[in-house]
Design a protein with these regions (language model features):
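Membrane-interfacial terminal anchoring regions of lipid-handling membrane enzymes
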Residues: 1-762
């Protein structure tokens, strides 16, 4: 059955034409008022059923068995509509505060609504299906009457959508539907054989796992949760959404499920995206997240509003993995949209974190196994002018403990969101067909080890492509440009004019490359002053105005926060920074050096494939000097109006240098315990900063040290090992010292050429 809405009286018959075939009408009416409304509607409609039965009638089995195969089965119910609030169909606070479901009010309320406001009581009719068609879809498992009743409820839900809005797409009887499917039973048998466990036991455990995973989508819970959590973001930011991108997605969503994969910088990300989608009448996403946010009372409410809480760790639990894949496959098959955050947690540095592949693996397997024809991945960029939680994340990077989530944490977070701090931009990148992206010459996920390795490699490339597309639509904010300018100056303050002269070539570069940005706000003194003032209000920038004119600098202790804002945009400048470093290498070795730098930075930034990278870097080098391959690199940089390596890369290569030198100092025969080693890097890094060997405190980031350690592991430098490893560790540290020296040289060239702008002697 499919669904459609009909007028509350005098409507057409289902399908819009009369038929000689008998019709069974299943009435989903729980109260006397609803039964009377359905009866009244039926008296004025053209539909003339041969039988009218309650939806859960005990006699339905007999009626279906005795009726001809061409008998049409349809269903009707009363759709109770909430009062309009601000022109939409969501239940307002008066309807949700007493926890009364405005979409299924108590019988005492129903009579009053039908009498005083009859437009809120609309009868909807499901699109009919023949008994023969229903038997064909049944599959032979369980009661046929029970199957028909369930299909009728689903069809009625579809019939209500034009009235309620498409944001309310509600899954029903999910666990039951999954367990009744022939594919589920086949997979259970195969899994039981692999595990050597009784099939009944595996089925029981899988059912329990599904019960824990499956989220309902109560419209009341959606409205209550949205109303309760809206203060966490509504006052803090003005939302600017990519409406053109949404319209493209709407058409695609008619045929396929969409999987929204946003960048993750704030707890508010999912709330903002949900509001943007609801405002444009998209169905609410099933949001997959960690069970750390399932605390009472938000957790139980969120689970009823489409939030799927997943265990943080389930490494060897094959039954849980199976249940998760089956659930994702079911949601894809029914075209429910999904949402999760591939980075696995909020970015502590402001740039995208490396993606995690677990959920994407199960999704790709579900598509490959035929649960859905395809799913489209939608990269989403959510970019903030400012974030109050950036300070807490910066403290974590300095070694502070993360505050656990709970009611007191939520209250504190809400208090911090009461005042406006800027704009948030939500942009949608070009969607990616998962089936097409995973197509390859190798076998599928279930092939041999070689096929499986090739499949995993394709999956990683898909995840990286999502990240590249997010970066491609992420706008460069005015905040990012201002912090980029101020962090490039060591321990100095700048006048307003000096800040503007640093910003001008940055804006010109963005315009020349046609990159998305809000740099127009920085074209005037007033615009720059406003951005600096907003940063000063949040104690990121300090202003001294006791002299001839105000001067601006990063507030002491706020360098990691400033770097957070800067890092949201630096991916646009990486090619330029690498090109500058390449020019300071031996001309005979420049392409090899470019590839070495790409490998050095690949754990921090997302690069395209090597051929694309070579093409992009060639264009950047040619912009610096058409004869770059043999040119005197120092002379080329001396004549450049824009130098970026020291502003973009210094904190990253400084952190790598700390890690490399500590590894070189360690006995190669001893293991390197990650936590203790990162603690050591933090302590020694602070000493190096005090000695002037590091540029600034933004290098002392636990996340940057962790990325550098992953780089070392990729180079097989972690050990344990022998003297060869000790030598390779020393070589690694020497090479990084050379890279840092080149970055410092570029800093000195920039200071010399812009002495009057930056106030720094070379």
């Amino acid at each position: 059955m499919d669904g459609r809405a009909l007028p509350d009286a005098g409507g057409e018959s289902a399908g819009g034409e009369s038929s000689a075939a008998p019709v069974i009408l299943l009435a989903d009416a729980a109260t006397d008022v609803e039964r009377a409304l359905v009866k009244q509607w039926l008296s004025g409609a053209e539909l003339r059923p041969s039988a009218v039965l309650p939806l859960d009638s005990q006699g339905l089995d007999r009626s279906l068995a005795e009726t001809p195969p061409d008998t049409m089965v349809t269903a009707a119910r009363v759709a109770w509509l909430p009062r309009q609030r601000d022109g939409d169909g969501t239940a307002g606070w008066p309807g949700v505060l007493p926890l009364v479901n405005a979409r299924r009010p108590p019988s005492l309320w129903q009579a009053r609504i039908a009498r005083r406001d009859p437009g809120r009581a609309r009868v909807v009719l499901a699109e009919p299906a023949t008994v023969a068609a229903l038997r064909e879809r049944w599959g032979g498992t369980g009661s046929f009457a029970h199957f028909v009743s369930r299909q009728a409820r689903l069809a009625l839900e579809r019939a209500e959508r034009p009235l309620r809005g498409y944001r309310y797409k509600v899954p029903r009887h999910v666990v039951e539907a999954i367990e009744d499917s022939p594919q589920f039973r086949r997979e259970i048998a195969a899994l039981a054989a692999r595990l050597g466990s009784p099939e009944s036991k595996v089925a029981e455990l899988a059912g329990t796992a599904l019960e824990g995973l499956v989220a309902s989508m109560s419209p009341l819970a959606v409205d209550v949760l949205s109303g309760a959590l809206r203060p966490l973001h509504a006052r803090a930011w003005e939302v600017q959404a990519d409406t053109a991108g949404l319209e493209r997605l709407r058409e695609l969503n008619r045929r396929h499920a969409l999987v929204f994969l946003p960048s993750h910088r704030s707890y508010a990300d999912s709330l903002l995206l949900a509001d943007v989608l609801a405002d444009h009448d998209f169905p609410r996403n099933h949001v997959l997240g960690g069970d750390n946010l399932s605390f009472w009372p938000i957790g139980p409410l969120a689970k009823r509003a489409g939030v799927v809480f997943i265990r943080r760790s389930f490494g060897g639990d094959e039954i849980y993995k199976f249940a998760l894949r089956e659930y994702l496959g079911y949601l894809l098959n029914k075209r429910f949209n999904l949402e999760w955050y591939m980075e696995g947690g909020r970015s502590r540095t402001g740039k995208l974190r490396p993606p995690r592949f677990g959920l994407l693996t199960y999704l790709a397997e579900a598509v490959e196994m035929g649960y859905a024809e395809d799913a489209y991945l939608v990269p989403v960029s959510i970019t903030y002018d400012q974030l109050r939680e950036a300070s807490a994340m910066a403290a974590e990077q300095g070694g502070g403990a993360k505050k656990s989530e709970g009611l007191s944490w939520l209250a504190s977070y809400a208090r911090g969101q009461m005042n406006r701090i800027g704009t948030v931009q939500v942009r949608f990148a070009e969607p990616l067909s998962l089936r097409e992206a995973m197509a390859g010459d190798g076998g599928g996920s279930g092939g041999g080890s070689g096929d499986r390795d090739a499949w995993r490699l394709r999956l990683q490339k898909v995840a990286f492509e999502v990240a590249v597309r997010i970066n491609r639509v992420t706008p460069v904010t005015a905040t990012a440009l201002v912090t980029l300018a101020l962090l490039g100056v060591r321990d100095r303050a700048l006048t307003l004019g000096q800040v503007r002269r640093v910003l001008e070539p940055l804006r010109d570069y963005l315009v020349q490359r046609d990159l998305p940005h809000s740099g127009e706000a920085l074209r005037t003194d007033d615009g720059v002053r406003r951005v600096l003032g907003a940063l000063a209000e949040q104690h990121v920038v300090t202003i001294y105005d006791g002299g001839v004119e105000p001067v601006y600098a990063i507030e002491r202790g706020q360098h990691l926060v400033a770097a957070f804002y800067r890092n949201s945009a630096i991916h646009y400048f990486i090619d330029r920074a690498v090109a500058e470093l390449v020019l300071l290498s031996d001309p005979a070795d420049r392409w090899d050096e470019a590839m070495r730098l790409r490998d050095q930075l690949k754990f921090e930034f997302f690069f395209p494939d090597k051929e694309s990278y070579r093409s992009q870097l060639s264009a950047e080098l040619a912009q610096l000097d058409p004869g770059w391959a043999t040119a005197d690199g120092r002379a080329v940089l001396d004549g450049s109006h824009l130098l970026m390596a020291h502003r973009v890369l210094r904190s990253f290569v400084d952190a790598q240098l700390v890690v490399a030198e500590r590894l070189a100092a360690h006995d190669p025969a001893e293991p390197v315990p990650e936590k203790d080693f990162l603690d050591e890097c933090g302590g020694v890094g602070q000493q190096m900063l005090l000695q002037g060997r590091l540029h600034g405190p933004e290098s002392l980031s636990r996340e940057l040290f962790s990325g550098a350690l992953k780089l070392a592991a990729n180079l097989d430098l972690i050990g344990p090992g022998g003297q060869d490893m000790a030598r390779r560790r020393r070589d690694f540290a020497d090479w990084l010292r050379d890279v840092v020296a080149r970055v410092i040289t570029i800093d000195e060239i920039d200071a010399e050429s812009r002495r009057e702008a930056v106030g720094v002697e070379p």
